[in-house]
């Protein structure tokens, strides 16, 4: 018997059953418990959502910016009021520790919504004189109905990252959460409605890619797609979106990000950063710094610091507030991570810690993989080249800065990068040479609302967050005004 009742689709400000009658199970990855049967949307449901979104968007766009912002700020207040309940639901669905979901997931999502409610007035055009008696001006108009596809690792945060700029700019959104973790997106839809968002402006269609995701990307009445997920899937989404109606796309994709520890770095600080860059959220973070470059002479000392820290990780029930490391999000993902670990062993990486599924006591019921550290890694190893999206740190040594930069950039990815050094001149010099969209100096992982987030190369197209993202959910109209009598050449 599932813990929760059947979860329906959210269309037009209310819950409705899927027209096809199909459902799928959502499972707690820490225990194997079935949490709910979720209705699986299809193309017919999408058509209904688009019709609802078009009607709602006309009303939403007709409101003043201030009126829209007031509604969004009411949603912010509701999110913060229900932080603990939403965090517990997120923990049940994702397996992330409650200590994490309470302090990060809903909090940072609400921060982004608050940010866009505040900066929506910044959507201002320009007025440019052309000559005496003639000028032009520009205005930013909403795109209309936009689609978004979320990832399973930060379900409600990603939903808010995508919805906030879209709604602030006057659009309606159809959001497809990951079929692995769809529960909190539905709660977000309830909150938007309670806050006063017009019916149809935020719809949630749970389901898999084949049933509804592909239909969403190619629907001719959807003007933009924002996608977060793997690079391979991102290519398919982009191809489908462009072939159907030349949709604009934003893609936040995979990464294999480098963290460079400089020769003058405080090794304790560097080890703390490397731990957070690899084992936070059990390693299931797209920006993780999984390729850790350390000077050859410092390898042994750095290994010792990592080993001391990794043994302090508290692995256990995600609902226990002492837990700092939970399971993989699903059995299928756990198996993929374990296969990469075995490949690392087979290709000659030296296993320092972990490298196995955890089966002690209650952990055996869940999808737990030990935090894993490999040393003596080389650039050609699969664990160094491919995104694992799990708790696997690859330690590499280098001899000089030029070598470190060259090797750090020798990847098809370019999502994030970091440098640890007390020498800020060196830090900026290295960061400016690294081919990555998000960079950190002496820290890792924070993505505040005003800071654009996105990748270079195969790690993405466009940006999330920041002022430019608000503009990306609009189209620019140019209007020339002639004050004098128009002179025809005919």
From Swiss-Prot:
SUPFAM superfamilies: ALDH-like. One of its GO terms (biological process) is glycine betaine biosynthetic process from choline. NAD(+) binds at residues 150-152, 176-179, 230-233, 254, 286, 387. It is an enzyme of class 1 (oxidoreductase). K(+) 2 binds at residues 246, 457, 460. The active site is at residues 162, 252, 286, 464. Its EC number is 1.2.1.8. Binds 2 potassium ions per subunit. The modification Cysteine sulfenic acid (-SOH) is found at residue 286. Keywords: Metal-binding, NAD, NADP, Oxidation, Oxidoreductase, Potassium. The record marks 248 as: Seems to be a necessary countercharge to the potassium cations. K(+) 1 binds at residues 93, 180. It holds the Pfam family Aldedh. It comes from the Bacteria. Gene3D superfamilies: Aldehyde Dehydrogenase, Chain A, domain 1, Aldehyde Dehydrogenase, Chain A, domain 2. Pathway: Amine and polyamine biosynthesis; betaine biosynthesis via choline pathway; betaine from betaine aldehyde: step 1/1. It catalyses: betaine aldehyde + NAD(+) + H2O = glycine betaine + NADH + 2 H(+). Involved in the biosynthesis of the osmoprotectant glycine betaine. Catalyzes the irreversible oxidation of betaine aldehyde to the corresponding acid. HAMAP family: BADH. Belongs to the aldehyde dehydrogenase family. NCBIfam families: BADH, PRK13252.1. This is Betaine aldehyde dehydrogenase.
